[in-house]
Amino acid sequence: MNKLTTFLLMAAFITFGLLTTQGEARAKAIELKFGHVGAPGSLFLACADEFAKRANAKLGDQAKVVTFGSSQLGKDQELLKKLKLGTIAFALPSTVMSSVVDEFGVFEMPYLVLDRNHMRKIRDEVFWSMIAPKVEAEGYEVVAVWENGFRNITNNVRPINTPADLQGVKLRTPKGEWRVKMFKAYGANPTPMALSEVFVALQTGVIDGQENPFTQIFSQKFHEVQKYLSLSGHVYTPAYLLTGKKTWDSLPADVQKILKDEAVGMQEWVYETAEKMETDLLNKMKDSVEINEVDKQAFVDASGPIYQEFGTKVPGGKDLIDKVQALVK
């Protein structure tokens, strides 16, 4: 074999090796599966897709966020398990987080969060320092605080004006301890159920009603099988961009930074989008359901025992409530 042939063979092997290495690098781009329960038209889906768009534009070939809505990857509890196992990268839980860490239950206190400006203060001055760190011991990491929204009651029995009108109403709630306690205190018969099961349960009369933000009510088509929408606004529920510690700690630092920056950076976009959707969707539902205002003071007056129990049962619960309420001033 002459020198020229040897040189050409070596060059070919080097070129092949470089191409193979580059191909393998591209093949190793990390797929970050993002599962959530939001249906088309929901705030959850809008937020997940916006995050994927923003993050993927910055991640290049390093990683890619891929979203799966409508409970395709599981219901809330199943998604939490998959996060911990590392089989998915992100989820967007809301009320269910109070079953993971007790302190998240503060967001189940009725009429505690007054508006989005109040929520901004709670997020920045209470949540990140007093609540978010506690999920790490459970195998999770909160990346950002987004929104589920202000919750309102729909049902097929009667318009709800005061807690007394809820007497005996079979009302679907999420699987959160304090939401169940709250509606029991109001006289309803709360029935915890996964979001994906609610439409059929309403349609068949297994339950009489449910409570959710407008974006969930409309996107899940609950207004099509309900007679009354009562504007209770009884609870504001955040949603949390959540990842598993196993997945998060395995990501390169620069990928973590991009994901964190984009998730936190779109928090204002989330609030603005949610506010616009509230107005638009209420108008769209006016022809489908009978809408009424409620006597909010009557609900506030009936909520005292829930605050008291949370304050005594959850370590530091009263202090947490006090700090949140102090931010109104």
Residue ranges and their predicted role:
Residues M1-E31, K329:
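Short, low-complexity disordered leader/linker segments with a strong preference
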